A protein has these predicted regions:
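NAD(P)H-binding glycine-rich loop region in Rossmannoid oxidoreductase-like domains
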Residues: 34-93, 99-105
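Conserved Rossmann-fold NAD(P)-dependent oxidoreductase catalytic core, especially the SDR/UDP-sugar
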Residues: 80-146, 158
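Conserved beta-loop-beta element that borders a ligand/cofactor-binding pocket
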Residues: 95, 146-169
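Glycine/proline-rich active-site loop of Rossmann-fold NAD(P)-dependent oxidoreductases
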Residues: 167-177
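A conserved pocket-lining segment of Rossmann-fold NAD(P)-dependent short-chain dehydrogenase/reductase
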Residues: 181-201
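Conserved small/polar residues in nucleotide/adenosyl-binding loops
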Residues: 204-209
Length: 209
């Protein structure tokens, strides 16, 4: 297959690209060139902001992708900026479980939806959870995975609503609460009861492929 990967140099996207290469697929990664691993697997690179992808429409046509993976769409405009350039081929999109109403309850400390969640659980009625609140570093105020899903829905894209994921190259350092204590020489780490299922990036990447 010839797979076009939008954003694919960090965390989950990086592992997806590596898995595609290991499988023998031809891969073209569209990214800004700010987080390109070195050394890395020998795949094609197109250095551009996704909002300027239309300037490289000929390169996309020449590559002639037979599948697309969108690994880093954070806003609706992130998607609409590429729809006119990316061909209508099978597409996989990384989304998040924060699209569910239960995420609002998590942020506000109120029970707003039944848990555990299932795929068809109620979606959030409110939008843009980080607007005016100062979200995580690098996350825009108009971040909204619901907008991402809606923008891709016209293409029949497969949307994967990922849970919290850990593993190598995680910029949010989700394991730091444990690693910090290990580095400090702690032999015991008192913690509360386990109430969260985590998924490892390596296996998430394999699932996408």
């Amino acid at each position: 297959m010839r797979v076009l990967v939008l954003g694919g140099t960090t965390f989950i996207g990086r592992r997806i690209v590596e898995q595609l290469h290991e499988r023998g697929d031809q891969v073209l990664v569209v990214h800004r060139g700010q987080h390109e691993p070195d050394p890395w697997v020998p795949v094609g690179h197109l250095h551009t902001h996704r909002h300027q992808l239309s300037r490289h429409a000929e390169k996309i046509r020449d590559f002639a992708p037979t599948a697309v993976v969108d690994a880093y769409a954070l806003t609706g405009t992130d998607v609409t900026a590429v729809l006119g350039v990316v061909p209508e081929v099978p597409t996989v999109v990384l989304s998040s479980q924060d699209v569910y109403q239960a995420y609002t309850g998590l942020r506000t400390g109120r029970c707003t939806a039944a848990v555990p969640l299932e795929e068809h659980a109620p979606l959030r009625a409110d939008r843009y959870p980080y607007r005016g609140t100062g979200g995580p570093p690098g996350i825009p105020e108009d971040y909204e995975k619901l907008d991402v899903e809606q923008a891709w829905s016209g293409r029949g894209a497969v949307v994967l609503r990922l849970p919290m994921v850990y593993g190598p190259h995680d910029a949010q350092q989700r394991e730091e609460v444990v690693l910090r204590r290990i580095r400090a020489g702690r032999t015991r780490m008192p913690i509360g009861a386990g109430n969260l299922l985590w998924s490892r990036a390596h296996e998430i990447g394999r699932a996408h492929v």
